[in-house]
Design a protein with these regions (language model features):
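Acyl-donor (CoA/ACP) binding surface of acyl/acetyltransferases
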Residues: 1-65, 96, 100-201
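A generic membrane alpha-helix/interface feature
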Residues: 77-80, 92, 173, 196
Length: 201
């Protein structure tokens, strides 16, 4: 897979984003992402040994339906994704946590920073989750933890999130976490052969 694919995966559609390598405080944080713990979850950096767990949900077309990447057809695609994430860690770039279900130590999804604007101290959070764990409040739990980290550790001023308007469940997660719906961007993203509207928070 090309770097262009993974840039699209991260949602790099903004005019001002993180440079290839972030220096200083932000780079240090992203190079050594702090583990976040919630009642049911551990949010930790991903590892190559997570490959089978990640492939298990990334191969699901329903999981991929409303995100910017296509369902993985082979485990090699998942390995390429993880190598990309590990490179982001090494470079101190905004990246993703693995969402670990404490009960089984299984990686069931990812959540993290799509980009970070150091001048305006703003970021966007994106996520994906195994279908086996939908409708259980898990993503709300994870998103609350990452929002706290964004404000308390990264000292950011603004945290954004956006989703396909055809996926209202994701909007409900944002609202439960105290985010405010700011509007709808028409034809904002070209994804899977069509332009889609997105709600922004």
């Amino acid at each position: 897979m090309s770097d262009a694919f993974f840039q699209r995966l991260r949602g790099e559609l903004h005019l001002k984003e993180a440079p290839a390598t972030m220096d200083g405080y932000y780079g240090d944080v992203f190079s050594h992402l702090p583990v976040l713990e919630t009642p049911r979850l551990l949010l930790r950096p991903l590892k190559m040994s997570d490959c089978q767990d990640v492939f298990a949900y990334c191969r699901d077309p329903e999981v991929a339906r409303h995100v910017l990447w296509d369902a993985h057809q082979t485990i090699g695609q998942t390995r390429a994704f993880l190598r990309y994430i590990l490179r982001q860690y090494r470079n101190g770039e905004p990246s993703s946590y693995g969402i670990v279900w404490k009960e089984t130590h299984q990686v069931i999804g990812t959540i993290g920073f799509m980009w970070l604007n150091t001048e305006n101290r703003s970021t966007e959070i994106g996520y994906s989750l195994s279908r086996d764990f939908w409708n259980r409040g898990i993503m709300t739990e994870a998103l609350q933890a990452v929002i706290r980290m964004a404000f308390d550790t990264l000292k950011l001023h603004r945290v954004e999130a956006q989703h396909d308007t055809a996926n209202p469940a994701s909007g409900r997660v944002r609202l439960k976490c105290g985010m405010l719906h700011e509007g709808t961007l028409r034809g904002r993203i070209y994804n899977k052969g069509q332009y889609i509207d997105v709600d922004i928070y």
